[in-house]
């Protein structure tokens, strides 16, 4: 197994992370190296990833340090140790969420909704801060008196947010993703978790968003979840034909939130209701109410 690692300045992390997710949508390991440097790593079998000597390179205009190493034959056990169960505690009146990989034991708590996600299939297992923050906001949203209703998950990845929404009673739920692997993974995960989710392959930059036209969408107040990176969220703000009732946006570095909130506010009239931060990452809840 090959481990391809890229070290980058924290302020340039977004660009590198986006490129690595294109290379390996199955997941990216994040290692903090002090205050100013972060390392991202992806794993693949020989031939799946380039095996490179240590070098200085560039992603666009961003300087990075790249290294490629072979890791021992017990890589699968190491990979499993990297993916641990995640418990998302709820507000009052809403069940907790327990997200686990299939090799971990179920929760012994009676008050949880359990979600089983295979981290080897697509990005998004609940372990990364951006996914976790979106799950926290989704629980808050599910506790509103007039929720849940229809939900659109843009960039569904492994389907963890769409599955959580279905577990919490949102319906219908539609997941969109550009990657074939993500569409297949979400369908598989929905079956494993016993929920009904529609999944479509979709290109945000080339196709019109479904469900935002009243003639096309389901009845009820639409919730949109978009755990994307900043450039795609700005594209989403420009491309939405009308505002949803609620929007949960993740995948942001904490210093990018104001720009994204401003874009959705200026274009669609959405306003910030709540912001969550974990380390350098952030997610935000915008409302049209």
Regions found by a protein language model. Give the residues of each.
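Conserved beta-strand segments that form the floor/walls of ligand-binding pockets within enzyme
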Residues: 3, 98, 116-118, 153, ...
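Conserved beta-strand segments of alpha/beta enzyme cores
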Residues: 27, 65, 98, 172, ...
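N-terminal auxiliary segments of SAM/dcSAM-dependent transferases
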Residues: 1-109
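S-adenosylmethionine
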Residues: 144, 178-288
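A short, charged helix-loop
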Residues: 109-119
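Conserved SAM/SAH cofactor-binding pocket of Class I
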Residues: 121, 125-206
């Amino acid at each position: 197994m090959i481990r391809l690692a890229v070290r980058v300045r924290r302020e340039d992390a977004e660009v590198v992370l986006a490129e690595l997710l294109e290379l390996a949508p199955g997941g990216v390991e994040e290692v903090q190296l002090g205050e100013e440097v972060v390392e991202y790593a992806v794993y693949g079998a020989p031939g799946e990833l380039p095996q490179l000597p240590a070098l200085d390179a560039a992603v666009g205009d961003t300087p990075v340090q790249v290294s490629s190493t072979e890791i021992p034959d017990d890589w699968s056990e190491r990979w499993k140790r990297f993916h641990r169960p995640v418990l998302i505690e709820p507000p009052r009146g809403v069940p907790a969420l327990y997200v686990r990989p299939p090799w971990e034991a179920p929760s012994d708590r009676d008050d949880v909704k359990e979600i089983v996600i295979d981290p080897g299939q697509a990005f998004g297992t609940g372990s990364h801060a951006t996914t976790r923050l979106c799950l926290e906001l989704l629980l808050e949203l599910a506790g509103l008196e007039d929720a849940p209703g229809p939900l659109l998950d843009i960039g569904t990845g492994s389907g963890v947010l769409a599955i959580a929404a279905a577990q919490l009673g949102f319906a219908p739920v539609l997941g969109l993703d550009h990657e074939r692997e993500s569409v297949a993974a979400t369908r598989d995960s929905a079956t494993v978790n016993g929920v009904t989710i529609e999944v479509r392959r979709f290109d945000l930059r080339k196709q019109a968003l479904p469900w935002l036209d009243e003639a096309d969408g389901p009845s009820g107040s639409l919730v949109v979840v978009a755990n994307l990176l900043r450039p795609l969220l700005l594209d989403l703000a420009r491309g939405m034909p009308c505002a949803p009732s609620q929007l949960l946006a993740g995948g942001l570095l904490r210093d990018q939130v104001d720009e994204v909130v401003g874009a959705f506010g200026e274009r669609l009239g959405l306003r910030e209701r709540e912001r969550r931060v974990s380390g350098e990452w952030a997610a935000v809840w915008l409302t049209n109410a």
